[in-house]
């Protein structure tokens, strides 16, 4: 990841990155962008980015909706509120939990200068790693929710939709990457999710805690991917999206 969206320096750095987009990627990256435009068609590549951003927006919106349902539906609201209250009583436990998302193991640049050195190809690889890392969690999420007594249709339908959107977004990013770097093999090295045992636990508190953490981490990563895509779109095309991107911390 460029930087975790929960990291303060990420929030401070990205607006500067967007404002200085015309000064960035002037060397190798600018050459690669012109190569893409000449050989593959700028319009088609932009269409792929537009499609990716739409899929990303839909995924983020559904994730927010689903998290809100978990807090409001009788199926899960009491458990989720208890988790929040327990966090308020034990800040150390809260920080440890919310900093243990499986994708947080990805390397990140620490400075603006390091971020400027990230190529278009490497940004796309980061997005692929994030999306790949969610394939198994989203599969098991949908499976386990169907086995949980009282899980409402509103949650089940959205779980399926998010999994489908994640797969479609991954396919779209791979199409973009194949045009940026033709013939490149897909990287299968991505962060592994290790909370399956907790999600399948017979102890309800443990199981719902796994659900809470999963949706917190999913919320962070859908936000991350969405902003990376808008950042790349701004870098490549300098269009209206540069002024439409907003940065804020997950509530």
Swiss-Prot record:
CDD domains (alphabetical): prolactin_like
Main location: secreted
Keywords: Disulfide bond, Glycoprotein, Hormone, Secreted, Signal
Pfam families, sorted: Hormone_1 (PF00103)
Listed InterPro entries: 4_helix_cytokine-like_core, Somatotropin/Prolactin, Somatotropin_CS
Cystine pairs: 101-217, 234-242
SUPFAM superfamilies: 4-helical cytokines
UniProt GO MF annotations: hormone activity
Annotated Gene Ontology cellular component terms: extracellular region
Carbohydrate-modified residues: 57
Similarity field: Belongs to the somatotropin/prolactin family.
Protein's recorded name: Prolactin-7C1
